[in-house]
């Protein structure tokens, strides 16, 4: 599990592409501290397993499913990527719950400055927007951000200068693809409330969680 607080921006050193997979080699420093082979590192919001370690970087395998559902396929040597190690049990929870399992890819539709703030508008499909709510959390390329506005085409986030400077947001331009992961809590609630047509409801498998119960509890 991750928190969406980027620890450093790494650089893609090499991409070895296979027929349906790839091996990324990434130059990094901070995320190498206490990292061992087999540990998880989020790369632009995608949970990858460290397969090799070097004094100044690491390698990770990327499978076919990940390439299809993310923007990693468009990376090249020299690309800047956001990096975060998996959260330790005694770590500070600075962002929100981030699984590192990307829901899909959005595209930056607009970037504008408002005094010191930088606004990013991202267009995304309905399968992603259904889980995006105003004032809720969303992960963009591994960055935990708060949704400021949402409509039928996409959503907007307002970022502070520190976030832009410490992530690869300062490299982003209109039209760029970005990895999106919506709040996992909303997905679980939807799953519990959705009728399961594939199997009969019995006392053993029928959920006791209802919409009315959630409303009573303040959701």
Locate predicted features.
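Conserved loop->alpha-helix
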Residues: 1-219
